[in-house]
């Protein structure tokens, strides 16, 4: 998962998984003092709970002349009224200890998970574009949410309960040893069998659980894709196709979860039969010892209760163990996410940047498809403030050039120079802070119109935002909304038209005030009226800026200083519009004729 793991890694856990799980505890380290206090109260609450069988045995089994099971100085535990008072005090103490333990564990867990979420998001947002090409967004978000929820339950409840059961087992066995070492040995005889079974079953359950988690992430990715592209799904009447595609995934999840449930059920059933069978046998032996006068009636009653507690703890441990194994698998996924390489922050800052760009014999293939050459020996220059247009059929390499300008990928051969400096030597953040993009498909984030424009410059003033909107020809339609710049947009807000979205994107770019502008077919999907407004805003934005225009409509690039004609990843021609249109046998001329016809 997350790009580097092999297929095998998706269904098995290795020793490395446990190492990664241990790495998670560094998130607990800042809160270790609170966590240790929580563990202290866990131990205290467990110990006080284990006084119950002894006191109850004394209450039910005492006849007034037997020595008390529990000896408390200056307290008469042969008197049932005194025993009841002591029990109430013990229950009160246990309630207080449990409350403090739960509060402290929650305090640590929520803060540690907050740190983990922050770290995961911080890493995720800094990963290179190639990472997101290798991993589906829906699968990533599902994986992170599911794994963190599982960790939350494990840290808050499962681990505490797991160790509480062990404390119960130790104290119960200790009491049984005090009563009769022979009975204790009979009880302990089943432990190795249960332990070996736990290891065998646990490994298999873990494997099935991890496979189910991966299938669940894949199904959530399909769900997100379908809901995001619901218009296309309905337009192509592919509802049934998507139902079948999603259905096949959840059937796989069902099979894995049922198989896991069968294994867990078999394991728990085996534990119940083995443990309670042993308990019944030991109680039978204890009853015989009572008849022979080897143990008192109070000891026998307490013995039965401790034995029941012991059996219940042994029965609970396997399921808790399986949950912890699932949490280890989740931790491995999260640690894998944190181990991916982020984009390098190293490099020189662009100072007094003019905006000159040069491609020198650039060749490039995407990391996941190295066998397909996308760009081949691309060379051109763009002077500061000039406009370079990129034209060509789909797949010719236009968008790839814009991706390389933004340093989304490193070139395989050649070099890209900004003001004569190799892009490899420029800090990524410094480069991108000097570039603005107006894409064909504008994404508006949930929030207000103002907040979306501020994405171009988060610290801008209200006056700067309004001025940017005016320059982008967006001010009038924004002011027509009831809440004006505070109008909510996105999934939960007002739906903007394509032209309105484009003008918000242009306002972002105006606010950013970049040296380099990339227009990725910004007007190709608009109607004539919207295109005129957007094109007018773009023309104003491009003044005195180095601009790269990926053009679908050739009419929009007539005034470009240089037009690069791309075909199969190569520049087959370049020049001004009039020069290229005059070449009747050229690719540009043919493209122009196709659009006119």
Language-model-detected regions and their locations in the chain:
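Short intracellular "coupling" helices and adjacent cytoplasmic loop segments at the cytosolic face
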Residues: 2-12, 110, 118-142, 146-150, ...
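Membrane-integrated ABC transporters
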Residues: 1-49, 65-83, 101-105, 109, ...
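Hydrophobic alpha-helical transmembrane segments of ABC transporter permease domains
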Residues: 40, 48, 97, 145-190, ...
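ABC-type nucleotide-binding domain
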Residues: 73, 353-597
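An intracellular "coupling" helix at the cytosolic face of ABC transporter transmembrane type-1 domains
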Residues: 30-33, 129-130, 146-155, 159, ...
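Helix-loop-helix
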Residues: 175-189, 259-332, 337
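Transmembrane helix-loop-helix hairpins at lipid-water interfaces of multipass membrane proteins
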Residues: 35-97, 177-182, 291-297
């Amino acid at each position: 998962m997350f790009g580097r793991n092999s297929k095998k890694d998706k269904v098995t856990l290795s020793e490395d998984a446990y190492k990664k799980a241990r790495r998670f505890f560094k998130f607990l380290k800042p809160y270790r003092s609170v966590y240790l206090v929580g563990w202290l109260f866990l131990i205290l609450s467990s110990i006080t709970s284990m006084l119950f069988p002894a006191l109850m045995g004394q209450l039910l089994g005492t006849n007034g002349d037997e020595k008390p099971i529990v000896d408390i100085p200056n307290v008469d535990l042969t008197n049932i009224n005194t025993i009841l008072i002591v029990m109430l005090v013990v229950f009160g103490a246990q309630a207080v200890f449990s409350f403090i333990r739960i509060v402290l564990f929650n305090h640590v867990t929520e803060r540690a998970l907050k740190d983990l979420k922050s770290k995961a998001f911080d890493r995720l947002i800094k990963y290179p574009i190639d990472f997101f090409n290798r991993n589906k967004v829906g699968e990533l978000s599902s994986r992170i949410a599911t794994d963190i929820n599982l960790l939350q339950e494990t840290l808050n409840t499962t681990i505490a309960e797991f160790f509480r059961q062990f404390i119960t087992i130790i104290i119960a066995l200790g009491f049984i040893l005090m009563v009769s070492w022979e009975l204790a040995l009979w009880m302990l005889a089943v432990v190795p069998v249960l332990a070996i079974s736990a290891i065998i079953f646990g490994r298999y359950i873990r494997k099935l659980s991890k496979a189910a988690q991966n299938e669940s992430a894949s199904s959530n990715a399909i769900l997100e894709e379908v809901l995001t592209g619901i218009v296309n799904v309905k337009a192509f009447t592919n509802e049934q196709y998507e139902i079948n595609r999603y259905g096949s995934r959840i059937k796989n999840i069902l099979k894995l979860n049922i198989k896991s449930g069968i294994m867990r059920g078999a394991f728990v059933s085996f534990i119940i039969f083995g443990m309670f069978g042993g308990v019944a046998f030991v109680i039978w032996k204890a009853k015989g010892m009572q008849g022979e006068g080897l143990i008192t009636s109070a000891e026998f009653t307490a013995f039965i209760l401790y034995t029941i507690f012991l059996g219940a703890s042994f029965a609970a441990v396997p399921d808790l163990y399986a949950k912890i194994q699932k949490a280890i698998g989740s931790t491995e996924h999260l640690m894998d996410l944190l181990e991916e390489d982020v984009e390098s922050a190293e490099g020189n800052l662009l100072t007094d940047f003019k905006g000159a760009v040069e491609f020198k014999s650039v060749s490039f293939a995407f990391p996941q498809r190295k066998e397909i050459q996308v760009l081949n020996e691309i060379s051109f220059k763009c002077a500061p403030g000039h406009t370079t247009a990129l034209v060509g059929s789909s797949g010719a390499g236009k968008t790839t050039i814009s991706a390389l300008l933004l340093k989304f990928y490193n070139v395989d051969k050649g070099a890209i120079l900004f003001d004569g400096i190799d892009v490899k030597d420029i800090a990524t953040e410094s480069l991108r802070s000097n570039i603005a993009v107006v894409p064909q498909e504008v994404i508006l984030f949930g929030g207000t119109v103002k907040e979306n424009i501020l994405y171009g410059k988060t610290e801008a003033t209200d006056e700067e935002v309004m001025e940017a909107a005016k320059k982008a020809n967006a001010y009038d339609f924004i002011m027509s909304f009831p809440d004006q710049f505070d109008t909510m947009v996105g999934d939960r807000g007002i739906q903007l038209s394509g032209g309105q979205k484009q003008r918000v994107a242009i306002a972002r770019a105006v606010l950013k005030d970049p040296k380099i502008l990339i227009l990725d077919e910004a007007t190709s999907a608009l109607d004539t009226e919207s295109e005129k407004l957007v094109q007018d805003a773009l023309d104003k934005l491009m003044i005195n800026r180095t601009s790269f225009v990926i053009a679908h409509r050739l009419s929009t690039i007539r005034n470009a200083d240089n037009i690069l004609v791309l075909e199969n990843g190569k520049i087959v021609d370049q020049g001004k519009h009039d020069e290229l249109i005059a070449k009747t046998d050229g690719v540009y001329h043919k493209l122009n004729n196709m659009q006119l016809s």
